[in-house]
Amino acid sequence: MAVKIRLTRLGSKRNPFYRIVVADARSPRDGRIIEQIGTYNPTSANAPEIKVDEALALKWLNDGAKPTDTVHNILSKEGIMKKFDEQKKAK
């Protein structure tokens, strides 16, 4: 089973809010998920609001889940991808 870390869209029209989730790559965008690991609000007042459970994200990355391009950028901004790369090089 190919697993991806990706965004599912919530919120109303022209006011998006996203959950960062782990899901089977074959399931629909807003379909069944395996686990929610964070949220992303691009329309918050000052700057985009990002909340990610770092331990869960690293667990899924180490288990082989592939992040989408957008989620990869979000995790990079949070410093999670850097920690993942360091863990991978240490092995």
Swiss-Prot record:
* Superkingdom, natural source: Bacteria
Database matches in Pfam families: Ribosomal_S16
| Entry's Gene Ontology molecular function annotations | structural constituent of ribosome
What GO biological process terms are annotated to this protein in UniProt? translation
Q: Which UniProt keywords apply?
A: Ribonucleoprotein, Ribosomal protein
- Keyword Acetylation belongs to the record: no
Key word Methyltransferase present: no
The record lists its disulfide bonds as: none
One cellular component term from this protein's GO annotations in UniProt: cytoplasm
**Family as reported in the entry's similarity comment:** Belongs to the bacterial ribosomal protein bS16 family.
Instruction: Please identify the protein, giving its name as recorded.
Output: Small ribosomal subunit protein bS16
